[in-house]
Amino acid sequence: MGKRRAKRLLESYEANGKRLEPGVCVMLRPPSPKTPSYIARIERIESDAAGRVKMWCRWYYRPEESIGGRRCFHGVKELFLSDHYDGCYPEAVEGVCSVHNLKDYAYLDVVEEEDFFCRFEYNASTGMFAPDTVAVYCKCEMPYNPDSLMVQCEDCKDWFHPECVNLPSRGVESMKDFICPDCS
């Protein structure tokens, strides 16, 4: 039996003009042009004896790819970090992206096409999430969605969707003080 040649770990690799290294999030070309890019985090990059390079990636899932599907509180740019790993080739990289935590994403002045956020880890085989509970807001008791406008009560400091407290959406951002129905 022949000796198996060792693979060599690479600190970084350049593909399509992009510097790739462990920890970097990438957008990967899907099989169909109608499908959005796949998003993954590079865990390691290795080269075999013939010089072929392969990245080991941890996948992010979109809500609609999970067992529970997309819910109304999921943001448009929301992803779940999964326990699903695969080998990928650098040639499939379309670009580099940023996957922020929810708090950092909410404070972005401008959300670019390459910006995403993640607040859950997802076990692809069981369909379970971590954390399995999340804070809820408003009278509707829904988790925070950065795509939905909310207003804070000056007294109790709770957050509300304008439509849930009978406020017109227009002009809410310029309101000086808001007092919720429970505090007024």
Where are these regions (language model features)?
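Cysteine-rich micro-motifs
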Residues: M175-C183
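Epigenetic mark-reader domains in eukaryotic nuclear proteins
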Residues: M1-K18, G51-M142
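Short Cys/His-rich metal-coordination motifs, predominantly Zn2+-binding knuckles/fingers
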Residues: C140-N145, D155-C156, C164, C183
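Cys/His-enriched microdomains
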Residues: A135-C138, V151, F178
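Short beta-strand-centered aromatic/proline hotspots
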Residues: V24, K34-S47, M55-W56
